[in-house]
């Protein structure tokens, strides 16, 4: 049994979220390390917020299919063929359905689109390319 903390970083945009990347990561951690989802502490890092994230009907339909019973929680219908998507909420659902305890999930609530001075945002830059980097490390106690 592994007794030390294993830092894992997993990226999930809208396609990864529809594909339940968080659950797939937990499954791989269980297989490779014997990790139990209930023992995990997870964080949902900076990304675009629901107010800034307008998606087309086909993307919204993919979320409705993947998250039956949760569409009203993660999609706001704009009545113009577009919806506002809550990726933070959708990923929280993925993690809790995979067995992570809700109280062990932290959401940064930092929107990349609202904070272009701090973080790159494809939407805020109107489609210009840029990069974000992330890292995680263990500090010796």
What is each stretch, according to the model?
Residues 1, 5-141:
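Active-site microenvironment for binding and transforming phosphate-containing groups
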């Amino acid at each position: 049994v592994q007794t030390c903390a294993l830092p894992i970083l997993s990226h999930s945009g809208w396609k990864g979220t529809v594909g339940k990347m968080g659950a797939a990561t937990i499954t791989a951690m269980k297989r490779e390390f014997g990790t139990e989802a209930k023992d995990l502490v997870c964080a949902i890092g900076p990304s675009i917020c629901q107010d800034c994230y307008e998606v087309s009907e086909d993307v919204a339909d993919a979320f409705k299919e993947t998250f039956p019973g949760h569409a009203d929680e993660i999609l706001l219908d704009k009545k113009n063929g577009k919806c506002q998507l809550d990726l933070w909420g959708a990923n929280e659902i993925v993690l809790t359905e995979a067995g992570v305890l809700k109280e062990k999930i932290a959401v940064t609530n930092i929107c990349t689109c609202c904070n272009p001075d701090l973080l790159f945002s494809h939407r805020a830059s109107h489609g210009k390319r840029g990069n974000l980097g992330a890292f995680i490390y263990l500090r010796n106690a």
